[in-house]
Amino acid sequence: MEEVDRLVTASITSIVSALGGCDLASEDASYVLGEEALACLKDVKQWLRAFDEKLGRSDVAKCIASTTLVVSDIPSILSTWNTQSEAGQASKKMDRVALACLEILVPLLWPIEINDETPDNVVASADLLRQAQIRYKRALLGHPSKSILKAVVRLCIPSVAKSKADRDQRDIGIMKLVVFFIRNMLAIDPMEANGKTDDINRSAILEAFENQGVLDLMLTLGSCTGYDIVGVDLPLLDSLYQMVKGLDVVEIFETSPNEPDNQLKNLLDTERRNKPVGSSRHSRFASTMTVLHNGSKISVTGPTASIEKSLEKFDKSKQPGRRLTKPTTGVWEVPVFVGHSAKRYIRVFSELFNDSAFNPLMQTVRKALEQEDDIGPAFKHYLVVLKWFLGVEMHRKTPDFGLIASVVNQEAFIIIMRSIRQGVQAKNWTMVKTAMDSFKTTLVVVNLMSDEEVASNIKARLFYEEEYLTMLADLTRRWALPLTFLQSAVDMTHTLIKTLESFTKANTTLYVRRRRLRAQKKADDTGNVEDLESLPGEEHESAIESRERKFNFSSFESRYFHEDTFTTYRMVLSSFQQLDNCYLGWCLKFLDRAFNKRKCRVMLFRLDYLQLFRTMVKELNSSNPWRKPFEHFFKKYMRQMIPMMKERPCLMVEVIFAKIPGTLHYLESGEEKPVRELKERTSKFVYEFTEGDDIPEERKVCILVASLLDEEKKQLVEWFIDELDSLLRARTGDTQVLNPPKATDELNVPKSIDEDDKFRLLMELVGFTLSRIPKSSVGCKTLCSLPGEVSRADIERATGWLKQWYSTPVDFEPFNKIKRVRRDDKERRGAGGDKEGSQDAEEDDELPLFLASDSEDDIENINDEMFAPVPKEKQQKTKQKLKRKGTSKSTREREKQRDYTAKTTIDIPMSYKSADFIGASDDDSDDERDRKFFEKENELREELRKAEPTINLEEKVDKAFKRQYAYVSDGEEEPLSETESHKQYREKVDEDRDDLSHMAERENRQYDFGDEGHDSDNLEIIDDDSKSPVAAEGTTSSQPIRKRRIVDDSDDDE
């Protein structure tokens, strides 16, 4: 340890001497301050700041440790000031002196943390300073006046009593100093003290806090945090953490007078089990057996040195082997035991804190933690305090979970998951263990809620992220960590699986958000997003989202059935003599679930598990409630393992080694796992040549090479040429097959071959066969092979074309020679033959509509204008075309578009062709029925001729049909002779036309969007299908309704 500078030592000693001292002449030997006591205290504070804090040294603190400043002077000053304050006699100068004492105590009592950035001189003097802090703590708690802590609390009462508007930075600083002093007193570890620690342990300080009003101050500050008092949230959280760490909620709330005796008995039993069996003075007679092994000698002496028991005695005398593990970051919490009075104080304080201060404090702290980029000590403090007070609320006689609602929500859950994720990344396993304990306690609290609807909502939010569930399942595979971490993992896993199982049974539509590898569909080269096949637009997107987000409990549970997870449970069970009974039950339930319910038997057929079960059944205490369940499980385990080994002898070898995932199905069922045929993934778009597919192969290669070079894919073409050259050098015959190396490895473009359809088409033209590689997750997923049927001459010819058009510029634009079309459209054209045939087929589908006449089979006037076919209505598109950017419209834009369409839409009748109402059964012919029909038609014609003999019936029908479908031209003269019914019908059509025009004008005025460049007179009613003629004017109200949209003329310009 470095020697302290003499100048510093002399200065500090002189300052402390001038501060004051005891007046031995008086009867009570009271402490008397010097004339410059306040200046002396300020000098000590300046020395601490200027020398220790700024220079990173500890010389001043070591000098103070050798004086009586903290042990005698400061406690005497605070005690005197407190007495004067209670009597109302304290002066402002004494108030400043007491505050200066507190400013010195806080840095001297600050916990010493050793890390990589701590200066060497501080590390060397850390033990000395910690011993000095223990002396300080003993002096402050054991002062005869028992009022030092009360004096510190009295210092901040004026600041707390002020309103938020009247409180300044000095008041906030005083409150922080007091809270830091409370934190420092709690943080000093009494385990490092030499000798007795009864006066400075947790029980002593809790009793002092209760008697001197510190707990009341903490309740007041916590209840006002956030809205009235700011700046003390994190220090107060740290104080609560130091108060409750290491304590067990169950022990605090379930205390019996005989419990200390039980604790001592348990400690003695543990010591006896771990103590090796050695020889005694009374066992030196009788026979002796000595075993020599690898140069070492082991002897057994005594009456028990018989052959059948010697080896067993050898094993008992051995110490259990210690497995060397990697050092873990952080310090594991040590259990702390407190007395009955301290348990009562902490229990009452915790209940009062939940009633008034928990929600305000935790909500303010959570908001502060959300601003932090990295997890620090404050995260651990938050998680420990959260777990403690949730446990307090669970163990109350009448729990009210509304008092802890600030930590049972999605925001607090995110803090827990963030601590686990970043803790795993930083290998801070202490943080991970604390977060697991907090998460488990949160699940238990949610399960205990009486309001099922609220609990179900909370669970749905907790389990929404599938990434978090996967991360929690992976924690059980960390079997190399200490037993404390593994116990927490087993505890959390048991609660999580039971909660998820019960929740999924009650809610079959539980969805979780899965992180997709691609956030959205990739756009094609034309800028349009690939259309979905089976369902239109948004409907198919919703189906995909639901299918991907639906939670499958069996799939989630199977993540736990891993080799490392079973190793973790074996590591926990191997310490069965030290475990509580609850851990034995949780482990057995998990193994039974895997072995019996999920039929994961082969994973448990391991030699270490076989030996473990045998030892547990033999050595578990008969009074243990889990002994019989383990015996039953072990019997079932052996009954299934022996027949399976006889059926599959390879299991006898597999019990020694870790199981290979690929062989699990065979070992379990005796059959090879069926290989799922992987569907070949083909693109929905293909490229075709505008000049036709009958052009020469050289012309196709020329167009493809020019197109690739135009797209700046020169390296891809060069790679292909080099590979073909190496192929020509390697191929010695015409029957060899080549699997060229993947382009992704050479060009560092992982999916060039997978996603470039033009390059794939070029490779296929050369003769390569492209197929998908199953279960390929890294790099290229395409297997490129060249069949042996492709001769060397073909390869040389293709290579020559590639080199020629790679170096020779072309006299055309490549994008005009090749285009991208949908694969199904191209296949449909290929299946339908030439264009003329397809046109004939379309014309056959659109046969004209015939009217009954005298001669039903007369089709001489088929080309007459009267018999023109009714134009076929264009199907309404259900898939929106997207913009060239390839990005889908947002929900807000789609809703805005639907509103605009609904406002600018009117309903008009629509005509149908008779083909729309003809079914397959109408093709059946019946001669007798036709004969009766024609006879009845002839009778009707005769009756009409008799009623009006001067009117030609066929001419009348002809005129009516033309008028109905608006085929009467403007110049055509219509006969004046018409019946009264025809006249009424024509007048009704004119009225309908006028009503439709007035309706369009009203809609145009009502939905005028205020475009400056558009005039409302330019609006006209147009059909969605611009190619369709005007709809029938004479349709009746019983016809189906079709919508028309009011469209601005300016839309056509866009």
UniProtKB/Swiss-Prot annotation:
The keyword Glycosyltransferase does not apply. Residues 823-838, 890-901, 928-953, 979-1017 have a biased composition (Basic and acidic residues). This is Topoisomerase 1-associated factor 1. Transmembrane segments: none annotated. InterPro entries: Timeless, Timeless_N. Keywords: Cell cycle, DNA damage, DNA repair, DNA replication inhibitor, Meiosis, Nucleus. Residues 877-887 have a biased composition (Basic residues). PANTHER family: PROTEIN TIMELESS HOMOLOG (PTHR22940:SF4), TIMEOUT/TIMELESS-2 (PTHR22940). It holds the Pfam family TIMELESS. GO terms for biological process: DNA repair; DNA replication checkpoint signaling; meiotic cell cycle; replication fork arrest. Component of the fork protection complex (FPC) consisting of TOF1 and CSM3. Forms a fork protection complex (FPC) with CSM3 and which is required for chromosome segregation during meiosis and DNA damage repair. FPC coordinates leading and lagging strand synthesis and moves with the replication fork. FPC stabilizes replication forks in a configuration that is recognized by replication checkpoint sensors. Belongs to the timeless family. The keyword Nucleus applies. GO terms for molecular function: DNA binding. Residues 522-543, 823-846, 865-953, 968-1054 are annotated as: Disordered. It is found in: Nucleus. One of its GO terms (cellular component) is replication fork protection complex. It comes from Yarrowia lipolytica (strain CLIB 122 / E 150) (Yeast).
